[in-house]
Amino acid sequence: MGDERPHYYGKHGTPQKYDPTFKGPIYNRGCTDVICCVFLLVAIVGYVAVGIIAWTHGDPRKVIYPTDSRGEFCGQEGTKNENKPYLFYFNIVKCASPLVLLEFQCPTPQICVEKCPNRYLTYLNARSSRDFEYYKQFCVPGFKNNKGVAEVLRDGDCPAVLIPSKPLVRRCFPAIHAYKGVLMVGNETTYEDGHGARKNITDLVEGAKKANGVLEARQLAMRIFEDYTVSWYWIIIGLVIAMAMSLLFIILLRFLAGIMVWVMIIMVILVLGYGIFHCYMEYSRLRGEAGSDVSLVDLGFQTDFRVYLHLRQTWLAFMIILSILEVIIILLLIFLRKRILIAIALIKEASRAVGYVMCTMLYPLVTFFLLCLCIAYWASTAVFLSTSNEAVYKIFDDGLCPFTAKTCNPETFPSSNESRQCPNARCQFAFYGGESGYHRALLGLQIFNAFMFFWLANFVLALGQVTLAGAFASYYWALRKPDDLPAFPLFSAFGRALRYHTGSLAFGALILAIVQIIRVILEYLDQRLKAAENKFAKCLMTCLKCCFWCLEKFIKFLNRNAYIMIAIYGTNFCTSARNAFFLLMRNIIRVAVLDKVTDFLFLLGKLLIVGSVGILAFFFFTHRIRIVQDTAPPLNYYWVPILTVIVGSYLIAHGFFSVYGMCVDTLFLCFCEDLERNDGSQERPYFMSPELRDILLKGSAEEGKRAEAEE
């Protein structure tokens, strides 16, 4: 083994040599990767310019309000349609046309109305003044009864027939319902089309389906939004509970690291065990109930997730998943029991480091605030870009007009050649688009918007990692702790990172952002190719997605350790990444023993907090806690606040545990350097604590013997 060490070190770089002047993070350093810093500043200026252009041309009202045939918004304050919030279709049957799928607009006149029609009435039968006044509100604005019936219907001034309707996503759709298996509107199974003929209700269904198909996602979003409006208060309470649990756990970990780790392990096993028991009880309870034996495949996708909870197969699937997870965790604990003891020692040392630099626990709030700014700017820019198209008008005709679907100008159309050749044609609003250079560049601007979001978000995360690494490295390389600790180590590390290493952070974030935007493009292409039958293309796409996923994980790992070296030595990104990689390769056994085991333990801690808060949220929002069952709000989908609480709890727990994770990684890298620089003698003493030295060196020796035995 001894003969192989020179070759091994030569292969993976040269070990650090003893330097009596080295006392931790170097203070006399220079700026690194200045070119990348300039690129970042130029990109930010360009990003601001894109935002200004988007905000100038964009109009979010196009998403919020429906638009009539003249491109005017329904229900918008300050307009003539302020009191007309609903969109009315003259002939809903025309919405069964393929044009709906191509242009997202029905080929029939549409107007804004105060309320949807609530009774049957044809234009032919609206003879009395009372009926005509009612009918007139569904005609085009400014309609005057100075034409014959045939001319009115030909010119599209009024609908041929009014059908009882109800509003759905601010649009009037026929009030269709089933009675004893028969489709009806009101009390009728057929309707008069206004031209003297009677048609079947199924024609209305087809038209409503096509129009409604474009709006189903928006309807789901509206219901989810309604759930948020009535449950946001309780969601915040759930997130506060998650924050309190995370903070309490971290505080206890500071003083009772060993005990808390074992308590965490046992609690995770118990929580999963309870989940298995609860799934089994629900599975048994549904035995014999009507409809509970329907399979998930036969049921298909349902937006109301409560339907799935009435199926035995759902609870069986949950029980199997939790059982597999329980078995995996127990097996890992059995095989990693000795390594867990070593990892606990490292966590104890990390707890002491956090205790001496307590302000590091508040830094995730800074990262959270900066990430919120990035998300808010990206989201608002994306919305304004997507709504910066102009109103496009198309020619619609019921007959065989050769100009159908061609672009037109509503102001000049009545006197145009197209109008003369196709007397029944109409020039009406079709969709939002445009053919200018700006409109052709919208897709590229959206990609740039997404890319800049990834770059800035990764930069914010990198800034946090370098800052925390600098603070914890100052703790490790203090020979007499805490006497040799510098004043305000966190603020000093933050200042050094921004002053000297903005370019290096931008470089690392840029590499990661490029990989992430490629993954987004691959996901987009994969969605477009789903309908294709080319198996080679599908296989190639799957392989590319897998490769770039692995590449992203590797770059994140390398960047994290490179940032630690930047915080300590102040070298540029490439040098830091190379030195960190070689240092890890020279200590590959310790990396496998410690780094991943501590990550596993922290993951269990996150699962414990998320599982506990998630179970509490489930029982609360499903009205299963008797004391407060009347307090829980009524919801369309109770999974909306539950999932929000679960995801939010994980992000909160991850924010707190990320401090510990960065601390462990920094201490581990410093420990590896300490072993190479020093030998534990009085002339070259170790900087690590005696407790950490004893258990880490002992564990490393055991792993080395095991590796030699395997060879």
From Swiss-Prot:
GO molecular function, one term: antiporter activity
Highest taxon of the lineage: Eukaryota
Pfam families named among the record's database cross-references: Choline_transpo
Known catalytic reactions: choline(out) + n H(+)(in) = choline(in) + n H(+)(out); ethanolamine(out) + n H(+)(in) = ethanolamine(in) + n H(+)(out)
Modification(s) after translation: N-glycosylated.
One GO CC term, this protein: mitochondrial outer membrane
Sections of the chain in a coiled coil: none
Ranges facing Cytoplasmic side: 1-33, 254-256, 337-364, 462-504, 585-599, 660-711
BP term (GO), one: phosphatidylcholine biosynthetic process
Cellular compartments annotated: Cell membrane; Mitochondrion outer membrane
UniProt topological domain (Extracellular) ranges: 55-232, 278-315, 386-440, 526-563, 621-638
Main location: membrane
Membrane topology, record value: Multi-pass membrane protein
Subunit structure: Interacts with COCH.
Protein name stated in the entry: Choline transporter-like protein 2
